Regions:
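Extended, polar beta-sheet/loop recognition surfaces of beta-rich domains
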Residues: 110
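Conserved small/polar residues in nucleotide/adenosyl-binding loops
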Residues: 102-107
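ADP-ribose/NAD+-binding catalytic cleft of ART/PARP-like enzymes
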Residues: 1-33, 52-55
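Generic structural motif
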Residues: 7-9, 61-64, 84
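Generic surface-pattern signal
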Residues: 9, 49-50, 96-100
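ADP-ribosyltransferase catalytic core
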Residues: 25-79
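Negatively charged, Asp/Glu-rich surface segments that serve as flexible interaction/assembly modules
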Residues: 67-101
Length: 110
């Protein structure tokens, strides 16, 4: 599974400083703890909306995973930061996600 995460320019999020590669925490709950990311890149904009200041990365969630029922947000106990995305890459990933949702929804209706 791959997901997306927004960060402050120094790779921090809510006071925690992430590092490239694997990051580990003991608990994962979408409402209160764990490392958060989103399956839909565009959901990152709800939390890190200033694209001129924030950075966005392709990540791989692992360990215990808790999913949110409001959007595609995920909390996990392991988060591997794979790489930073350029703005163009971010929107290409978002478009691919939308196309994947559309084609899977369309296939379900057949």
């Amino acid at each position: 599974m791959y997901a997306y995460k927004g960060f402050e320019p120094d790779l921090s999020c809510r006071g925690y400083r992430f590092v490239m590669g694997k990051n580990v925490t003991p608990e994962a709950n979408c409402a209160s703890n764990g490392f958060h990311c989103a399956e839909d890149p565009l959901d990152c904009l709800s939390y890190y909306g200033d694209m001129n200041r924030s950075i966005y990365c392709l990540v791989q969630p692992g360990g215990d995973i808790d999913e949110d029922d409001r959007d595609s947000k995920i909390a996990c106990t392991e988060l591997t930061i794979l790489r930073q995305l350029t703005r163009k890459e971010f929107f290409l990933h978002a478009l691919a996600y939308i196309c994947l949702l559309y084609t899977s929804d369309a296939a379900d209706e057949l």
